[in-house]
Amino acid sequence: MVKPRVIYWFRTDLRLHDSPALKAALDLDPSVFWPIFTWDPHYVYRARGGLNRWQFLEAPQTLFPKLFKAWKVTHIVFEKDTDSYARERDSIVTQAAKDAGVEVIIRSGRTLWDSDQIVEKHGGKPTMSITQLQAAGSKLGQVKKPIPAPKNLPDPGDMPVNFDQDEPDTKPDFNSEIRTEGDKTYTKISGPKGDFAIETMEELGFPPATTPHRGGETLALKALDEIIADKKYTATFQKPKTSPAQFEPQATTLLSPHLHFGSLSVREFYWRVKDVVDSYKGASSPPESLIGQLLFRDMYFAAQAALGYVFSQTANNPYCRFIPWHLPSKRDPETGLVTGEYHVDSEEADIWFKRWKAGMTGFPWIDALMRQLKDEGWIHHLGRHAVACFLTRGGCYIDWERGCEVFEEWLIDHEPACNVGNWQWLSCSAFFSQYFRCYSPVAFGQKWDKKGEFIRRYVPELKNMDAKYIYEPWKAPLTDQKKAGVRVKGDGLNNVEEGTYPKPMFDFAKRRDVCISSMKVAYQVGLHGNDGQALDGTWRKLFPTDRGEVQGDVESGYGEHADEEGKSDNEAKEEGEGTSSVKKEDDTTKGKRSARRHSTEKVPKKKKV
């Protein structure tokens, strides 16, 4: 009998420790073992990915059938991926393998519990709270213990690639703006230099990344060891009590990127923490604890697994409230899925969106967070709260899908399920409904950092501003502005002068009241994304014409509203961390299609909730 010839397909499981799929591959006792990672063109072109998340280009759907034949493959093994695009891709690869007589082995390992099994135990419905997740998880039993890394791997055999390459469709290319050269491919499995090394950004046609954060299994396990060594921190961690203004080092673990790429096993993290918590008197508990963050992550993964593509949009999503935001998404008339384009129903709201993305809102706390996000690919979860609330229900009244797309592009820990879920949560579109709890772009930052050191670090224009004015520089007298070496003028986008910082986009107190009033109406109307009136446009008859009206007032000095502290069960609990260019955007960005949500998948029939 011929011994197995096995391809192991690495995707979001870039590790050797606790890999059920890798163990299944090695348990076959293969005579030949090929560990393969492919640059999937979907993520190169159609998924927004900034430089900080890039560290043989052909679609796996066409590449693997060729490898099956050229290498006489008998088995292909990979870890399960419930992201919507990944399901579609894996279905095609699986069918191609079966057609070629290749056995397919798939194992779950990306989450604490198998997301599909969670959905099954939850009656086929998405998990909308960690209480629901825990109830479904309890029916599956405790989280499985991690398995050790293999001591060695079989050598790969010959790897001929003397077959024609099917070049992928490169349009639309969401990442064209950040390429310095044409996209690059190579035809040797060993890479462009023949040394099997990870490609550099330059070798892929991009400028160097700017993030200080680095990946890899070795660094992930070292970071976990350091966290676990501090038993008090590990056992008493409460995420809402960690500071979004703390940097170098940050206040939280920063392990979320490792969970995304799979360089750290979520089960390894869970059990290492649980062992400390179980032996520590006075330990914190979910949802605020470290384990609570992992539960939120599983909750979002299961919600996505239940709904598929429509989870990532309002349209046709029966669990997402319909709110008539500014800059709403356009939809494909055939599939009902959003395209990545958006309607500009308000030119001023479009300018607000551009200023928010550029970190030029005129509110230093918001701008510091957005600049940190772009430069480093990561911000603290409360920082994500602040900028998301500001863009949606607490300031601009702009569609959460616009912010979700920016996070998709810039976050190094971008998980599609967590990013979408967090934006729905923070916009009060799903998961959370206390829309009257808004984050002040002034008072909330002052709560953590009265002197404004975080702002001085990420908004260097204001580094010499007196602490009295650093959160509200427009209130500083001209003499104080001159002393600080900065003038508050302009919008930060057009005719920007050196030594200036923009005026605030609007009077926050007024905008907050407008947004809360508009949210109240939306909740009273009570439409969800799959309701006919939300889909056919007749919702307009149910809403006043001044919904979330745009009205800027940049000159007034105004009062601030600190975030209210009331909590109730799932309502006020904090979401998981894995939530997800200052250059001015041009109008072409509105015409790009997002394959993150666009597919030929059929839209499910409406269902009442």
Model-predicted regions and their roles:
Residues G123-E334, V338, D449, E453, ...:
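Glycine/tryptophan-enriched, flexible segments
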Residues Q61-L67, Q95, D99:
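Structural beta-alpha unit
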Residues Q238-S243, A251-L254, E334-T339, E347-G359, ...:
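Active-site-adjacent structural elements in folded domains
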Residues M1-L63, R540:
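N-terminal beta-strand-loop-alpha-helix module at the start
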